[in-house]
Structure formats: C-alpha cells, structure tokens
Amino acid sequence: MTNPHDVIIRPVVTEHSMAEMGEKKYTFVVAKDANKTEIKKAVEKVFGVSVDKVNTLNYDGKVKRMGRTQGRTSSFKKAVVKLTADSKEIEFFQGM
C-alpha cells in the first residue's frame, strides 16, 4: 500500500482506548492486509509522530440472524500504536 490514508481507516473511540491514551497508546481500525511495518510508517507520516511499537488484532465478523436468513458482519483488523516517550501526542485525539 502506497497511500498511508489507505492503511488507517478510522480511530477507535472507546472507554478503554481513551484510558490508554495516557500511556501514549492509540487505537485504529486498519486495512486487513496491512502489516505492522506499513501501519507504523502510515501513523508516522499522517500524524508526524514517532512510533515505538505496533500491536495488531484480527476480528472475525459475528454471525447475525434475521428470521431464517443468516449472515455475517464484516471482519476487521485493529492496531494499537504505542508512541515513543519523547514523541508528541496525536492532536486528533486531544478534544475527546
């Protein structure tokens, strides 16, 4: 993936992810085929910070039923990005 905006899809705003912001950990939904190196480069380029570590989690879609019809929600990949100690915070999350 060449465009970093194709790697980072959206931020995850939950109570748990907001609590981790104090430790300079930020959570994003990322492209399913993105690896840790691509995620690190994309966050550094888009937000202008230096990344220390990237943890990824793959989520399978849940099975949902509506009467006799059965389907699945979309699966997705989540990344928890830890910034270095001397890095500035991501300004996008400051107002939350």
Curated annotation (Swiss-Prot):
Annotated organism of origin: Clostridioides difficile (strain 630) (Peptoclostridium difficile)
Molecular function GO terms recorded: rRNA binding; structural constituent of ribosome
Gene Ontology CC: ribonucleoprotein complex; ribosome
Protein family: Belongs to the universal ribosomal protein uL23 family.
Assigned keywords, A-Z: Ribonucleoprotein, Ribosomal protein, RNA-binding, rRNA-binding
GO biological process, one term: translation
Gene3D superfamilies documented for this protein: 3.30.70.330
Function as written in the Swiss-Prot or TrEMBL entry: One of the early assembly proteins it binds 23S rRNA. One of the proteins that surrounds the polypeptide exit tunnel on the outside of the ribosome. Forms the main docking site for trigger factor binding to the ribosome.
Assembly with partners or alone: Part of the 50S ribosomal subunit. Contacts protein L29, and trigger factor when it is bound to the ribosome.
Transmembrane segments: none
Protein name per UniProt: Large ribosomal subunit protein uL23
SUPFAM superfamilies associated with the record: Ribosomal proteins S24e, L23 and L15e
